[in-house]
Structure formats: structure tokens, C-alpha cells
């Protein structure tokens, strides 16, 4: 093991990277409420892991979606646990995100020079809510169907572009297979990718600027 480590150390300077990560200064005013962002990240990672596991069994079609979810819950080994953890961590992620936003706002963490960190955080909040909207529809039960119908119908009130925008969201004039396909793609590919990118930007800026001081 020593030789393997030395081989990587010679090329990547692993020890220098580890020292930089572990030696970052933490202000004395930092308390448990400053961990809310990290808890949100942890929930996101749990979401990725459990969501990936369910993609092996979930079928994104209007005729098979509900049955595939029932199959996960009743037939797949620990499928009920995986889906339950996915749902619980989703709720926890939203809650932790809201508390994190309040903490940052109340402690002035959005002020100069951390404006861009705040902007990326707001974008991450929008992405988190979008996860909830798209994921809610995937079981394609009565609640999911009507939730999608209502949410995608909201833009119709916008003058001129309302109707075309609704059709883009649904994939057709009415809610159906195209809508489910769009929401599944958003939930499992587009939103996770965007979230990972903006989280990386968010953390790099925090790393560069450090934790904001007390008010």
C-alpha cells in the first residue's frame, strides 16, 4: 500500500491537497446552523443514490409507471426502503434548504463580496423545488397526474406566449406520455446535472471567500 500511495503522491501531491482541505480556518462564531448547507448536500447525494437504484425498475410510461412503482414497493428486495428513503430525504432536502436560506439571510451571508454565492444558492433553491415538481408526477397516480395538469397549466394565463409555453411543458396540447417523458428526463438527468454544476460553483466560491463573519 505504501508504494501505491507513493506513486500517486509523486504525481498528484495528495498530501498537499489533504492539508489544504483540513487546515481551512473556521471562524469562532460558527455554530451548528452553519451545517445546514452540508446537510442539504448530503440529502442530495442520498437522492442521487436511491433515485439511481430505482431507475433499474421504474418504467416511464403512462401504462406502466404506477405498476412499476408498486413493483418496487412490494417485490424488489428493500425496494420499499429505497423509495421511502428517497421520499424522506427529498422532504428533508427542501426543509434544510429553506433553513439554510434563512440562516444565510439573517447572518448577512449574501452581502459583498458573496453576491454570486447567494445567486448560485437561489438557483439551487429553484432547482430543488423543480425536483419536487417533476418527481411528484413520476408514480403517475391520480395525485401525480392532476398535480402535473395544474402546474403545467399555470403559464396559460400569460398573454401571447402562454399557450405555446404550456404545450412545450406538456409535449402536446394535453397531459400524456410526452409530459411524463419530459418530467422523467428533467428529474433524472437535466436537474441532477445542473444541480451538480451549481453546487460545485457554490462550494468553490465558499472555499475561496471563506465563511462570512458575524453581524
UniProtKB/Swiss-Prot annotation:
Cofactor: record remark: Binds 2 heme b groups non-covalently with two histidine residues as axial ligands. Binds one heme group covalently by a single cysteine link with no axial amino acid ligand. This heme was named heme ci.
Statement: the UniProt record of this protein carries the keyword Cytoplasm: no
Annotated heme b 1 binding sites: 100, 202
Record: residues binding heme c: 35
Main location: plastid
Listed Pfam families: Cytochrome_B
Topology relative to the membrane: Multi-pass membrane protein
Transmembrane segments: 32-52, 90-110, 116-136, 186-206
Gene3D superfamilies to which the protein is assigned, alphabetical: Cytochrome Bc1 Complex, Chain C
UniProt: heme b 2 binding residues: 86, 187
InterPro entries named among the record's database cross-references: Cyt_b/b6_N (IPR005797), Cyt_B6_PetB (IPR023530), Cytb/b6-like_sf (IPR027387), Cytochrome_b_N_euk/bac (IPR048259), Di-haem_cyt_TM (IPR016174)
GO cellular component, as recorded: chloroplast thylakoid membrane; membrane
Keywords of this entry: Chloroplast, Electron transport, Heme, Iron, Membrane, Metal-binding, Photosynthesis, Plastid, Thylakoid, Transmembrane, Transmembrane helix, Transport
GO biological process: photosynthesis; respiratory electron transport chain
Superkingdom of origin: Eukaryota
Note: Heme 1 (or BH or b566) is high-potential and absorbs at about 566 nm, and heme 2 (or BL or b562) is low-potential and absorbs at about 562 nm.
Record note on quaternary structure: The 4 large subunits of the cytochrome b6-f complex are cytochrome b6, subunit IV (17 kDa polypeptide, PetD), cytochrome f and the Rieske protein, while the 4 small subunits are PetG, PetL, PetM and PetN. The complex functions as a dimer.
Protein family: Belongs to the cytochrome b family. PetB subfamily.
Protein name from the UniProt record: Cytochrome b6
Taxonomic path: Eukaryota, Viridiplantae, Streptophyta, Embryophyta, Bryophyta
Amino acid at each position: 500500500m505504501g508504494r501505491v500511495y507513493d506513486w500517486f503522491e509523486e504525481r498528484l501531491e495528495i498530501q498537499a491537497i489533504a492539508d489544504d482541505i483540513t487546515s481551512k480556518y473556521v471562524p469562532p462564531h460558527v455554530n451548528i446552523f452553519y451545517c445546514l448547507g452540508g446537510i442539504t448536500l448530503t440529502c442530495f447525494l442520498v437522492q442521487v443514490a436511491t433515485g439511481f437504484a430505482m431507475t433499474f425498475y421504474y418504467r416511464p410510461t403512462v401504462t406502466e409507471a404506477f405498476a412499476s412503482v408498486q413493483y418496487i414497493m412490494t417485490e424488489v428486495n428493500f425496494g420499499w426502503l429505497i423509495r421511502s428513503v428517497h421520499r424522506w430525504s427529498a422532504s428533508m432536502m427542501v426543509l434544510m434548504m429553506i433553513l439554510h436560506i434563512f440562516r444565510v439571510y439573517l447572518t448577512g451571508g449574501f452581502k459583498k463580496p458573496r453576491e454570486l454565492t447567494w445567486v448560485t444558492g437561489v438557483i439551487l433553491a429553484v432547482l430543488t423545488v423543480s425536483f419536487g415538481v417533476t418527481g411528484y408526477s413520476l408514480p403517475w397516480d391520480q395525485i401525480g397526474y392532476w398535480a402535473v395538469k395544474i402546474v403545467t397549466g399555470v403559464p396559460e394565463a400569460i398573454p401571447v406566449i402562454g399557450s405555446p409555453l404550456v404545450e412545450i411543458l406538456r409535449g402536446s396540447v394535453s397531459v400524456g406520455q410526452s409530459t411524463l417523458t419530459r418530467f422523467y428526463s428533467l428529474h433524472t438527468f437535466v436537474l441532477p446535472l445542473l444541480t451538480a454544476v451549481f453546487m460545485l460553483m457554490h462550494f468553490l466560491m465558499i472555499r475561496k471567500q471563506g465563511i462570512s463573519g458575524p453581524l
